[in-house]
Amino acid sequence: MLYVITLVTVLAGLLHYYFTRNFDYWKKRNVAGPKPIPFFGNLKDSALRRKPQVMVYKSIYDEFPNEKVVGIYRMTTPSVLLRDLDIIKHVPTKDFEPFADRGVEFSLDGLGANIFHADGDRWRSLRNRFTPLFTSGKLKTMLPLMSQVGDKFINTSDEVSQTKSEQSIHDLVQIFTITNIAACAFGLNLDENMLKTLQDLDKYIFTVNYSGEFDMLYPGILKKFNGSIFPKVVKQFFDKLTKDIFEMRKGTSSCQKDMIDSIQELRQQKTVDLWRKHDNEDVKPLELTDGVISAQMFIFYAAGYETSATTMTYLFYELAKNPDIQDKLIAEIDEVLSRHDGNITYECLGEMTFLGRVFDETLRKYPVGDFTQRNAKTDYVFPGTDITIKKGQTIIVSTWGIQNDPKYYPNPEKFDPERFNPENIKNRHPCAYLPFSAGPRNCLGLRFAKWQIEVCVVKVLSKYRVEPSNKSSGEFKFDPMRLFVLPKGGIFVNIVRR
């Protein structure tokens, strides 16, 4: 018995040492930070699914208001959380090269070849090839298609609001974003079965799992052992979807001017030259297989569908709470549409300046992109400090913390679109607003997301008003199981005909 007790004690001691061996790292370097907990570091609440990870980082941001750089532990791995905006400006822009990688790579066979998760030369090459798909010129051709999807969505809204005016707004606008992404990105006109299939995929893509924590404990292990952060069913679906779409198109263009037309042109090239540091460098080109294209289609869908749906959920919620802002927005929509014969065009959206401010303020208060993560490719001393981040370590920028900091946004809980009038923008630090990150690794689909949301908002508010619901009158309790931050149980509003 004594032998067993001794063995258990020794094993417990070894495990404790192993999972706390790095916890004096920042203390030795005189870098302030929260006290880590064995095994979990500073992420106990998110690892145990008590809070979303983004809210854990916001809490750390709030806890150290006088620090430029905060030393944290993502599980057992030393990392930093940046608070100083001048330092933050260096990371994605001025000193981009040392921080070009996100550090969230995983198996290329598990959709890891997508442009968001790819790092290094692979990311550069994909970015160069796929950026032209999101130019203003390309997106302008999609606006009529977005408008058609919006008209169908209004018919759906009519049906559901007649049955019950009180609606889970997230569930409702998801119908628009799924249908719009399917039309604009895949050239598909969804039937009810396909819509249901895509809705069922939601839980596999946007429910958090423990692969992230595992990769923090052992950085790079997912890529090394061909692991993925998504279940096989997701890859199988997008592989089949890609194959079916290209077989259906048979190399011909559609009359819709969707994204598949542009992807087909890339597909015919067979390969993409990887980025070279030197002209004479011998680098094997990236083969544009259907698997690589499938990974891009997956990320276009995942990023374009759920982030927009979540943003619109908060936008309509705030309009319901602030009827004066809603009145002003409706007046602008009515006036501008009357000048354009009721048609939504590029010029029409450009004239809706207050709509743009409402969009920006929504993402200020609720930055669904959550936080920025970058992996150091070299040792780097943060400007204005003597703090060094080592090669392979991770930096975190709490977008939610910055954009809800009263230092930059007085009374941050107030929803105030005038924070984004030209004068206020001019007087604010550029890194005080980072919903799409910044620099070369910012969100590639920024314009698409904005236009998608604006088209839907214009369609809805030209016919309806949104009013508060008693179901969503209290303080939000965010769902720790959701990848993008949403309250448990959703957000409800009443949709009322004007």
From Swiss-Prot:
Compartments, as annotated in UniProt: Endoplasmic reticulum membrane; Microsome membrane
CDD domains: CYP6-like
Stimuli inducing this protein: By xanthotoxin and bergapten (linear furanocoumarins) as well as by angelicin and sphondin (angular furanocoumarins).
Keyword hit for Heme: yes
UniProt-listed InterPro entries: Cyt_P450 (IPR001128), Cyt_P450_CS (IPR017972), Cyt_P450_E_grp-I (IPR002401), Cyt_P450_sf (IPR036396), Insect_CytP450_Detox (IPR050476)
Pfam families: p450
Reported cofactor(s): heme
Gene3D superfamilies: Cytochrome P450
Enzyme Commission number(s): 1.14.14.1
Molecular-function annotations in GO: heme binding; iron ion binding; oxidoreductase activity, acting on paired donors, with incorporation or reduction of molecular oxygen, reduced flavin or flavoprotein as one donor, and incorporation of one atom of oxygen
Membrane-topology descriptor: Peripheral membrane protein
Catalytic activity reported: an organic molecule + reduced [NADPH--hemoprotein reductase] + O2 = an alcohol + oxidized [NADPH--hemoprotein reductase] + H2O + H(+)
Positions of heme binding: 443
GO CC entries: endoplasmic reticulum membrane
Keywords: Endoplasmic reticulum, Heme, Iron, Membrane, Metal-binding, Microsome, Monooxygenase, Oxidoreductase
PROSITE patterns linked: CYTOCHROME_P450 (PS00086)
Family indicated by similarity: Belongs to the cytochrome P450 family.
Stated role: Enables the insect to feed on furanocoumarin-producing plants and evolved as an adaptation for detoxification of xanthotoxin and other furanocoumarins.
Name this polypeptide is given: Cytochrome P450 6B3
